């Protein structure tokens, strides 16, 4: 009996160390239900505004985002309605049409946008994050309504922090789904404020 007890006491610290290494992600029934609804969204259209602040530049742009599994189109315009950037993303890569009718392609959409505009925007991850899905996140937290409050992700050795400050109820398949209306992305001294004024889901 003594040997058996001693054996389990020896294993206990190892078990506790193993447990502390597991990611502490929320797993409430309400969150799982909400996450399942979000995962059913195959296509969306989002219209809104983006504010970009960094030591090098400040930009205020309108955006129109049409996303589907096969193709995602993100267009930025100025307040005068002029197209600043027209980005198309597919599984094969990214393509940009500039205001002077140039067409540039690259395998990485984020790098292409930065190359052309100087703006650091994780556009490839945003298709999930903008609807409130923490896919690929290193960590995330929920609010009292069991929707995303924040998430964190390391991209190219840089830590991104995304905070969700406001949600809006949107109709989807004869039910109501809360989707982000305001969120902010921060990476060191870079900050993006995104306001979604209109959602259309399919």
From Swiss-Prot:
Summarizing the function annotation, the protein's role is:
Plays a critical role in the incorporation of lipoproteins in the outer membrane after they are released by the LolA protein.
Quaternary data:
Monomer.
Where found, per UniProt? Cell outer membrane
Q: Where is the lipid attached (S-diacylglycerol cysteine)?
A: 19
Q: Which CDD domains match?
A: LolB
User: What are the boundaries of the signal sequence?
Assistant: 1-18
Official protein name in the record: Outer-membrane lipoprotein LolB
Keywords, comma-separated and alphabetical: Cell outer membrane, Chaperone, Lipoprotein, Membrane, Palmitate, Protein transport, Signal, Transport
- One Pfam family named in its UniProt record: LolB
């Amino acid at each position: 009996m003594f040997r058996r007890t001693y054996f389990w006491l020896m294993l206990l610290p190892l078990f506790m160390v193993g447990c502390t290494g597991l990611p502490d992600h929320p797993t409430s029934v309400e969150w799982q239900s909400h996450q399942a609804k979000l995962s059913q969204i195959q296509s969306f259209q989002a219209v809104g505004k983006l504010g970009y602040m960094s030591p090098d530049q400040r930009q205020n742009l309108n955006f129109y985002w049409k996303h589907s599994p096969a193709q995602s189109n993100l267009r930025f315009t100025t307040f005068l309605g002029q197209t600043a950037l027209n980005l198309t993303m597919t599984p094969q890569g990214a393509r940009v049409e500039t205001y002077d009718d140039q067409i540039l392609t690259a395998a990485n959409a984020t790098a292409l946008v930065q190359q052309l505009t100087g703006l650091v925007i994780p556009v490839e991850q945003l298709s999930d994050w903008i609807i409130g899905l923490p896919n690929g996140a290193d960590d995330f937290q929920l609010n009292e309504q069991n929707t995303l409050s924040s998430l964190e992700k390391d991209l190219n050795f840089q830590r991104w922090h995304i905070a969700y400050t406001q949600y809006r109820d949107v109709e989807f398949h004869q039910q109501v789904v809360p989707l982000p209306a305001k969120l902010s992305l921060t990476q060191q001294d870079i900050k993006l404020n995104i306001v979604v004024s209109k959602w259309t889901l399919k």
